[in-house]
Amino acid sequence: MKNNKGFSLVELIVVIAIMAILAAVAIPTFAGFITKANKASDAQFYADLEYAIQMANAGTGKEVSGLTVTTDGKGVITKVEYKLDTTTVTIAVSNDAATVTAPADNAANKETVNAAKDVIAAMDWSYDFKSAAWADGNGND
């Protein structure tokens, strides 16, 4: 008589069924962990963004509030808005341009940077509290 050293078909089906049950339980659990991690990451990003905005406007004596972040369907940020007292500051971003509209007495206080047209190594923005004007570090107001 031949000595068989293997699993029967029934044993293999039982093992596959057990693995399928474990996978059916484990996959939603892991998906839940990923969702929680993404939400925590988003919350930390927004907190960091709000802190950076508050620090950038700390010397103005104006209250920063109402942070709103708009994203496209893929989660890419397209617009950031916040209130500086009653004035709205808007940072709009597209594929090849970023437009910052800063608080001022008129709507002309706006700077657009177009990556397709402008050669940009670095741009440092500063705010002169005496003249109440923004400058881009290149002598442009």
Which functions belong to the PLM regions below?
Residues 2-3, 34-37, 107-108, 115:
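Generic N-terminal leader/processing signal
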Residues 3-31:
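N-terminal single-pass transmembrane signal-anchor helix
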Residues 29-51:
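Aliphatic-rich helix starts adjacent to a transmembrane/signal segment
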